[in-house]
Every structure is written in structure tokens, then in C-alpha cells.
């Protein structure tokens, strides 16, 4: 893809999200979602091969269905309220339909089936955009309508997402699929806390985006796509491989890394709201995510695959990929836990 065309498409993707963020008119929000969806398709098909085309088609059909349900919810709300403006009060049917549409866009269970397949079928850079930037607009619309959402609808979806995000990643060897299932689990955590402390959801989203962005950038730096290729990078770039594994543990929520902050604060907030069963189940299912990340770290560091090259001297070319943002992003993704007391302002 030529640079001017790529720049125009990326600008349209960014513009679509910004329109959603800055609008209080439901029609403009819907138009922003449509701009974003139509512009991301060429990015997903950047590497023209059958798998990328299949993934783009799956993504388009899912997002088009979600947009149709969202427009139906907007129309029903217009019939009841007589206004297009986003307000704190929505009729129950419109709120339910909008919640389902946003859950489809986010990949919450049981609408999660497209996330691993699409992420695996596209290029690593396209997967990065898919799992980070594309989550911002739906989550912030969910944030704005959170007072009207029925907890009996959103909480079961959130709980299923955390559970499926943990189970799905257990038998994966493809790194993109592992990150996709991790994304489903993180969306479940964010959906849970949206009902009780929406501001904390924004903190969770920020930390998730930083960790996922850094992980994808390190994968692209090392050109790794599977657990086998990751284990073979010790001889080439031992420092980068160590950072990748540390980031994996942070994504799993292992203390004292940054990924532990949102889980800690969400469980604390749910407990303050006199909920016992939900935080207990979330903490138990979060162990599934932590398990497959720790297993990946263990197999990469303490065991050797048969095809791993153990030579002390190895032909090595200088890496021409210069990523200036990697050092600060890596520090933020792993060492934010000491600032947690400062976040008491969210209470």
C-alpha cells in the first residue's frame, strides 16, 4: 500500500473514532462507527492473501451487524424520547439493544468468536490496531450509557468473557491468538467495572492499551508469531525476549507488574459495593490467564525446543527496525505498581 493512501486511511480511522468521542448526537456516533469500520478494512487486507481477506470479511460482517442493531436501538430510543441527543435516560429496550451492539463490537462473550480468527488472519500491525485503537470508541460509548445499562445483561457477558478469555488461550501456540483471548478477558474486566466505577474502566483501558501496544511492538521487532519462534530468539535478542516474557506476565496480572493494578482495584471496588461472588469468580478465572502466560514463560526460558540453536556464536545482522517509543512503553507496562496509592483519587 502506497504511503499517501495508507495515511488517508489511517486518518479516516482516527477521524471516525474522534467523531464518536466528541459527539452527543446518536446519528453522528453511528456515522463515526461506520467511518471507522469501512476505513479499517483496507488496513486488515494490507497483506493480500486468502486468510487476510477471510478475516476482513468476518470483521466486516460482525461490525455491520452490530451497527444495524445499534441503529435499531437508536431508532427505538428516538420513538420513546423524541430526541437524538445522548442523555442519561434510555428506554430499557433501546439500552439492551445498544449494549448488545457494543458487546459485539468489543468482542464480549458470547459475541467473541470473531476476535481470535480475525486477529490471527491479519498482519501483526493490523492486529495491533484491532486490539487497541478499535476498542476505544465502543468502550467510551458504553461508559456514557453506563447509568442505563441493565446489570443482569452486562455482568453475565463480562463473566463469560473473562472465563472464555482464560480457557481459550490454554491450548494456543499462536501469539496473536493468545493476545486475542487475553483481549477478550480484559474486555470482560472493563465491562464489569463500568457499572460501578466508569472512571476506573478508563484507567484499565489505558493500562491495557499500553501493555498490548508494547507487546505487539516487541513481537514485530523480533518477527515472532508463534511460541516456537519466540523460544528461538534467545540467541538473537536475549534482552528483547526477556522483556517480552515480562510483558506477558504483566498482561496475566502477576504482581508486582503493572497488569496487577487494574485487577487489584476492580476487585477492591466490587468488594466496596458489597459484592462477594463476582470478585471471587473473577479472581479465580483470572488464574487461567496467568497460567497460560506463565506456562509460555516457562517453556521459553526453562525448556528447549528440539529445533533451538544452542551455538554460542551465531550469524547476526543488525536489526534495522528502530522503535524509539519501546523503552518508555516497556517501563510503563511493567513498573507502574508503586504509583497505585496515587490512584485513590478515582474513589
Swiss-Prot record:
Pfam families the UniProt entry points to: NADH_dehy_S2_C, Proton_antipo_M
InterPro entries registered for this protein in UniProt: Complex_I_Subunit_2 (IPR050175), NADH_DH_su2_C (IPR010933), NADH_UbQ_OxRdtase_chain2 (IPR003917), ND/Mrp_TM (IPR001750)
Gene Ontology CC annotation, any one: mitochondrial inner membrane
Keyword presence, Translocase: yes
Keywords, sorted A to Z: Electron transport, Membrane, Mitochondrion, Mitochondrion inner membrane, NAD, Respiratory chain, Translocase, Transmembrane, Transmembrane helix, Transport, Ubiquinone
Record membrane topology: Multi-pass membrane protein
Cleaved signal peptide residues: none
Transmembrane segments: 3-23, 25-45, 59-79, 96-116, 122-142, 149-169, 178-198, 200-220, 242-262, 274-294, 323-343
Top EC group: translocase
Gene Ontology biological process terms from the UniProt entry: mitochondrial electron transport, NADH to ubiquinone
Subcellular location field: Mitochondrion inner membrane
Catalytic activity: a ubiquinone + NADH + 5 H(+)(in) = a ubiquinol + NAD(+) + 4 H(+)(out)
EC number, as in UniProt: 7.1.1.2
GO MF, one example: NADH dehydrogenase (ubiquinone) activity
Subunit structure: Core subunit of respiratory chain NADH dehydrogenase (Complex I) which is composed of 45 different subunits. Interacts with TMEM242.
Family, similarity comment: Belongs to the complex I subunit 2 family.
Function in brief: Core subunit of the mitochondrial membrane respiratory chain NADH dehydrogenase (Complex I) that is believed to belong to the minimal assembly required for catalysis. Complex I functions in the transfer of electrons from NADH to the respiratory chain. The immediate electron acceptor for the enzyme is believed to be ubiquinone.
Name recorded for this polypeptide: NADH-ubiquinone oxidoreductase chain 2
Species: Suricata suricatta (Meerkat)
Gene (name only): MT-ND2
Amino acid at each position: 500500500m502506497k504511503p499517501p493512501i495508507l495515511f488517508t486511511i489511517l486518518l479516516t480511522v482516527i477521524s471516525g473514532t474522534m467523531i464518536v468521542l466528541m459527539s452527543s448526537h446518536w446519528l453522528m456516533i453511528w456515522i463515526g462507527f461506520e467511518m471507522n469500520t469501512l476505513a479499517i478494512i483496507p488496513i486488515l487486507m494490507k497483506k493480500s492473501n486468502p486468510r487476510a481477506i477471510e478475516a476482513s470479511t468476518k470483521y466486516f460482517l460482525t461490525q455491520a451487524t452490530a451497527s444495524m442493531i445499534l441503529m435499531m436501538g437508536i431508532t427505538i430510543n428516538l420513538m420513546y424520547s423524541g430526541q437524538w441527543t445522548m442523555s442519561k435516560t434510555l428506554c430499557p429496550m433501546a439500552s439492551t439493544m445498544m449494549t448488545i451492539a457494543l458487546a459485539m463490537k468489543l468482542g464480549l462473550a458470547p459475541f467473541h468468536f470473531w476476535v481470535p480468527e480475525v486477529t490471527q488472519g491479519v498482519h501483526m500491525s493490523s492486529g495491533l490496531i484491532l486490539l487497541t485503537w478499535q476498542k476505544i470508541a465502543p468502550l467510551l460509548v458504553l461508559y456514557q450509557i453506563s447509568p442505563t445499562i441493565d446489570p443482569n445483561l452486562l455482568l453475565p457477558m463480562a463473566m463469560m468473557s473473562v472465563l472464555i478469555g482464560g480457557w481459550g488461550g490454554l491450548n494456543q501456540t499462536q501469539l496473536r491468538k493468545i493476545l486475542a483471548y487475553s483481549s477478550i478477558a480484559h474486555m470482560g474486566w472493563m465491562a464489569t467495572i463500568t457499572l460501578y466505577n466508569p472512571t476506573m474502566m478508563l484507567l484499565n483501558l489505558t493500562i491495557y492499551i499500553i501493555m498490548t501496544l508494547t507487546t505487539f511492538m516487541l513481537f514485530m521487532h523480533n518477527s515472532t508469531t508463534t511460541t516456537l519462534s519466540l523460544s528461538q530468539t534467545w540467541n538473537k535478542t536475549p534482552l528483547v525476549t526477556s522483556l517480552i516474557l515480562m510483558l506477558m506476565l504483566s498482561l496475566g496480572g502477576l504482581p508486582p507488574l503493572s497488569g496487577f493494578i487494574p485487577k487489584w482495584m476492580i476487585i477492591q471496588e466490587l468488594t466496596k459495593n458489597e459484592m462477594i461472588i463476582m470478585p471471587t469468580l473473577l479472581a479465580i478465572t483470572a488464574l487461567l490467564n496467568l497460567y497460560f502466560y506463565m506456562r509460555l514463560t516457562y517453556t521459553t526460558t526453562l525448556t528447549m525446543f528440539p529445533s533451538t540453536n544452542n551455538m554460542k556464536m551465531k550469524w547476526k545482522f543488525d536489526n534495522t527496525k528502530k522503535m524509539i517509543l519501546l523503552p518508555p512503553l516497556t517501563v510503563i507496562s511493567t513498573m507502574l505498581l508503586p504509583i497505585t496509592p496515587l490512584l485513590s483519587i478515582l474513589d
